[in-house]
Amino acid sequence: MSFGRSNHVHRGILMETEIRFKIRHRETFADGESFGNTGQYERIAGEIRFAVDPDSDAYSMVVDLKHAPRNDHGFVEFATDFYILKPADLAQGNRRLLYDVNNRGALRMLQFFNDAVHSNTPSTTEHAGNGFLMRRGYSLVWSGWQGDIMPGDGRQTMRLPIATENGEEITGVTRSEFIVDEHGVLSMPLSANGYTSSYEAISTDTRDATFTMREYESDQRQPIADDDWAFARLQNGRPIPSAFHCHLPRGFKPGWIYELVYTAKNPNVQGLGLTGVRDLISFLLHDEADTEGTPNPLRLNGTRMEKAYGWGRSQSGRFLREFVYRGYNEDSQGRRVFDAISPHVSGGGRVVLNYRFAQPGRYPRPHD
């Protein structure tokens, strides 16, 4: 993708940030159903392309951003999916933006507020549920923030740059845990699940890694011999060498903790998930149009969003805590981003996001 620097004077976000909306779907929501005094809703989906100045103070906290590739204007590029449900007539809405921090790429807000059937691409009356948020007039927004989520099932994803140092690959020690729930599992992605990408091992030689197992967290780790496992995946029942998978021919014991420590390469700049949310919400609150003049979808004929609220369940609530605690609830002009946040059933933790080789989908459990 290519970006040009913009001099639009109407943009609220300064020259350190460029935003381009690529709208791919725009249509009436829920078969044109009318929701009380708010009326009909509109569905908008597509991609947002960002270009940010890595030398700006607004991005100084993003780990490895200075090691990311730059375009011809010195900006770092990345992109995210987005999804918006808004009143067809914004003037009939309540001028409130409600942002749902997706949970591992999944959209959860309508399930919990509207008693709706879950969908990552809500479009029907069934997906509107009881219509509660629509009758109240909210504009609903989703976007990607977790850079290791893989495409599929309508999940919200990001496309992040890979950091390098002086043109060379960055490597580092990383750790992965595997816990399976059933017998017969012989191979696992290094990320421990099928919807999260794995950091590539620099070598498939098992002597360069450490693989252990234990039944309980407090137990002593039992080494697994180098010859008893492989960096491999199964294809038609046969192991194929893979720097992204772990293969244990005797099978993983259900409930046991398997820990793999290995040297990985090519970390992506995960911290841009935090700035991407910040800059998107700031844009939707304050700007008339993006860098190329595409109108702000939540601003029309003098009607604009006056407040923004963030909601997240479990992992998503932990993201909101991290977002606030790290100082991202202030945009590049010192304005508040979210007026309120609601971390729902998220425990007391935060996400591990703005680190080299971050794995934001990981979370502590009593067993591991």
Where on the chain are the PLM-derived regions?
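A signal for specific C-terminal beta-sheet/loop modules enriched in small/flexible residues
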Residues: 1-2, 48
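C-terminal His-loop and adjacent cap/lid subdomain of alpha/beta-hydrolase
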Residues: 16-368
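Short, Lys/Arg-enriched N-terminal segments with co-localized hydrophobic residues
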Residues: 3-14
